[in-house]
Curated annotation (Swiss-Prot):
This is Alanine--tRNA ligase. Its cofactor is Zn(2+). It comes from the Bacteria. GO terms for cellular component: cytosol. Consists of three domains; the N-terminal catalytic domain, the editing domain and the C-terminal C-Ala domain. The editing domain removes incorrectly charged amino acids, while the C-Ala domain, along with tRNA(Ala), serves as a bridge to cooperatively bring together the editing and aminoacylation centers thus stimulating deacylation of misacylated tRNAs. Catalyzes the attachment of alanine to tRNA(Ala) in a two-step reaction: alanine is first activated by ATP to form Ala-AMP and then transferred to the acceptor end of tRNA(Ala). Also edits incorrectly charged Ser-tRNA(Ala) and Gly-tRNA(Ala) via its editing domain. It comes from Ehrlichia ruminantium (strain Welgevonden). Its EC number is 6.1.1.7. Belongs to the class-II aminoacyl-tRNA synthetase family.
Amino acid sequence: MIKHNLVSDLRRLFIDFFVKNGHQFFPSSQLVIKDDPSLLFTNAGMVQFKQRFTSVDDRSINTAVSSQKCLRVGGKHNDLENVGHTNRHHTFFEMLGNFSFGSYFKERAIELAWDFVTKELALDKKRLYITVYHDDQDAFNLWKKISSFSDDKIIKIKTNDNFWSMGNVGPCGPCSEIFYDYGESVKGGLPGTPEEDGARFTEIWNLVFMEYNRTEEGELSVLPRKCIDTGMGLERIAAVMQGVHDNYDINLFKALIAMSKKESGNSSCEIAHRVIADHVRSAAFLIAEGLTPGNEGRDYILRRIIRRAARYVYMLKYTDSLMYKIFPVLIDETSNAYMADYYPELFKAKDLIISILKTEEENFKDTLVRALPLLEKELTYLSTGDVLSGDIIFRLYDTYGFPVDITLDIIKERGIRFDEKGFYDNMEQQKTRSRLSHLIKSTEQLNGKIWEDIRQNYNNTRFVGYDNFQVQSKILSMVMNNDRNVTVANVGDKVSILMDITPFYAEAGGQQADTGLLSVVRRDGKDLFGSSNIADVTNTKNIFDGLYIHECIVKSGSLIIGDIVSAEINSHRRKDLCANHSATHLLHYILRMEIDNNIMQKGSLVGNDKLRFDFSYNMALTEKQIKLIENRMCDLIRQNHPVETNICNLQNAMDNGAIALFTEKYDNHEVRVVNIGNSKELCCGTHVKYTGEIGCFKIISESSIACGIRRIEAVTGQYAIDYFRQQEKVLYQVAESVKSPVEDVLVQIDKINRENQELKQKLWAAYFDIIDMQGVNIEKIGNINFLHGTLSSVPIDVVRKFIMKRLVKDMIMLFSNVVNHNKIYVVGVGNSLHSKVKAADFVKIIGCVVKSKGGGNAQLAQISTEYIAEVDVIQHIKDELVSIFNA
């Protein structure tokens, strides 16, 4: 019998019950599925066990229990627009589940479920109802036997709500649900009735009996190993146990909502607080797993969640950032919303979560301030049932960056409809403009219309560059100066060339394009030996997903449409590109293995001279970590692992552990997998044949490029050797400069620094003497000591240090100083006076006199001006002091 009904208590009770009944406990898998680009986020408890359901041979684990983090935003399962408006929808939720992989089936699954809800949770049986699939008489009979329910409490459902499948083909089976009756005070009817959408009867547990396999023809056959997959929403069962029929009234959400109301100072607009509470939790978990707000894929989902919450913060008329102030409730042990005990990643990433929530919300406030008044103006002309023009919605999105889903939220609240056709017509026009713009950009002002016309006449270029550095190819089309078709290109002409076959890799996946030569070997059916008709290939682009455009400069002779050319890439450059690309894969692998398994690639650039790798991580790498990465890389290079590529379907690649970037688009049927030791990635780039060809590896920089995103730059092969030589050269130059042997350079530099510091101290003391000699005037104004003086050619940092050293709590100091024809005023105010006046206040007063602006804080501030005419600034300050302190 349960003694406590907090969310954390219920989670522990569920897990303990099934462990006691022979199930192996599995921690929650991540929301971000790194090896499955077909799924945005984990959206059900069974996701981490996918392969166990489909593998007949894997019998290492027969049963499991978990409490799984889930997110339903985007894709098939998208609850975002309902969040805050209903009692039970969330973006993030936890799914309690028990699973059997051929161990037990219907009867045992039903027994366990019934024992848990009636004995462990002690729910009133009178309030429970059961649904089964209408054809599943077996489940009906078992429920009747185990629960002793009458027929009217076991409801047969004919719709697919009670038949579950993993997809259009594959494992599937009937399911059975347990419903809880909140009583007549809540509206709603029994499952299967017209009133079933009400809140009275709430599904609390779904038991899936996976016993069939569906073929592509839709036929069902019995699985050789029958499985059980169950799911109980933790928030839903918490609502039942806490005697509320609204998930937002459970202890966890009450704590989050209370903090939202407290920090915002606004207790009205309940929907806003519910949305904010839900979205803070979702965003925190996503950031903890390495996501950062962006414009593509999963990163955009995170941005979308934060921005949607920011809009509701704006509705509360709260002008500061709010979300980052609510998040700490989730990691506060004394809070009812404490989740960091079961999910320690929240505490580990707390600084990053706070930083990203604050920054992203602040940035979006500007968009809200600009766009919302325009939307509000348009809505004043509309009434309930009217339609908001798609042109307006698109303009808000395109011009102001105002998310469409937020616009839809706003108009939905007012009963105004969405002009879907008008909006998507605008989007299609924009896509067309964008596609042409991309063509123009990708081929240096290339006329996109010309290439669209060419595209209609030719098939995709056949790329053979993985295995060939040189091939013979036919020139099919040429565009001169990016604006006209030509049949001949002569010396000096810049021409974009389409050929039927090419070894030139076009820029993709972060790897730069190949360069090389085209030499005419046959013209008009005649072989040309020692041809002088040559063009340099300076760049290669892949447009229309398959048309390779070679940007060339004719160096000698001419090129004519129909010519057969020897197309040869710069092999030395290609080998450098291959080395850097393979090293990039290994770097990604090492970062995840040695630094943090949550690290995700955020971008890369593979050049011939260096590589650049951007990744999610919330702190700078230490010197020790960088050394570890370099050592592991050198180990992998010395081990000379073969680099293997294979083509397979996407699902097979994922099942074998290949990593895919969610921002990339992959063919559902065929993908290219690059295997380097234990590193497996989907990749279309070029690579070395053995890791030994990388030669050597050196990280040359590690830095932050955005909140939560780090960047590593590195060199390999000859470029790494050149880097070492350059560093060695600098070291010898430094040794010569400080007159020391190389091995003693650090000792000598340390000695020089100490001597320099001693001299600096003497210099500061001398400057202080100069200030004293140039004249420091002391006046008493009431109880205040006012020190002021006029200086000449004293460094400004010396003046600031002088003030900070001499300033006492009841003193105000003001010095003017002429430096490089500018007059600079520096003001200091003692701590005890800050309640009445601050240094920055005096700078504003001076600014009004000398027509300039300055800045500072309560204790120290300064202002610079070219206005050097004699103005009695001192007298203005004295008058102000008399006024402030009533002297």
